[in-house]
A protein has these predicted regions:
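Acidic/Gly/His-enriched mid-domain segments of enzyme catalytic cores or analogous surface patches
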Residues: 107-111
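A short beta-strand/loop micro-motif in the catalytic core of glycosyltransferases
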Residues: 36
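Charged catalytic cores and adjacent phosphate/nucleic-acid-binding surfaces used
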Residues: 1-6, 10-16, 20-26, 32, ...
Length: 235
């Protein structure tokens, strides 16, 4: 059985706090087999992770959390950035054209600036036959969502429309990587993709913090990373 976390942010996200190397190191320490770096509307972090992955003994899937007009979408295996603010359908078409696949991020969740896709938008998109093979899953568990009931609603929704279930951390700090994870048969990224397409992935809830602890941890880490960025930017 393999274990993956397919929703992790780095300092390439405006609100991320961890370097790519730190993310890879932490993922290996906690026993993850596969991760995806999914920075907000940016693929540079994923590209860096792909370059460094072999040094840490972990597989990396290139990804991006794209801001669509209707909410956030996790895209995987894309090679170029996709313009934010497009409709969900147009975004999915562009993911498809790059040979990628997508998962709806934290559907129905709210709070902390989360821009979540609603069931109506997802169902509307799935009416388009040309993208049914692109939108393959629902993030049925988000490990750092402060809206706990949204995970339950997401699981019920995913069951109803028969898409793959993923559990992810949505980590913006190093401490929460792996708080949500996806179990799959096998251990490689190729095995994971087979499980996603076969709808056989399983959600694993690894850990959970209170909303206060999630927010306070992010705040402290963000201050630390901001000082580090400032120091690097100084001549």
């Amino acid at each position: 059985m393999g274990l993956a976390d397919l929703h992790i942010h780095t300092i390439y996200s405006y609100d991320g706090t961890a370097t790519v190397a730190a993310v890879l190191r932490r993922a290996k320490e906690i026993g993850l087999d596969v991760i995806a770096i999914t920075d907000h509307d940016e693929i540079a972090g994923a590209q860096e992770a792909m370059t460094l992955a072999s040094h840490y003994g972990i597989e990396v899937i290139p990804g991006c959390e794209i801001t669509t007009a209707e909410g956030d979408l996790l895209a995987y295996y894309i090679k170029e950035k996709i313009k934010p603010g497009l409709s969900l359908v147009e975004t999915l078409l562009r993911v498809r054209d790059q040979g990628g696949v997508a998962i709806a991020a934290h559907p129905m969740a709210g709070g902390m600036g989360m821009k979540s896709l609603k069931p109506y938008s997802i169902l509307k998109a799935l009416k388009h036959k040309s993208i049914r093979k692109t939108l393959i899953g629902i993030e049925a568990y988000n490990g750092t969502s402060i809206d706990r009931m949204s995970n339950r609603y997401a699981q019920l929704f995913a069951n109803g429309i028969k898409l793959a279930h993923t559990g992810n951390s949505d980590a913006h700090v190093i401490d929460t990587i792996g708080f949500g994870a996806t179990e799959f048969d096998g251990s490689t990224a190729a095995d994971l993709m087979k499980s996603l397409l076969a709808r056989t992935t399983r959600v694993r809830k690894m850990n959970e913090w209170s909303a206060f602890r999630v927010i306070s941890s992010w705040g402290l880490r963000y201050i630390e990373s901001s000082f580090a960025r400032f120091s690097l930017a100084r001549p």
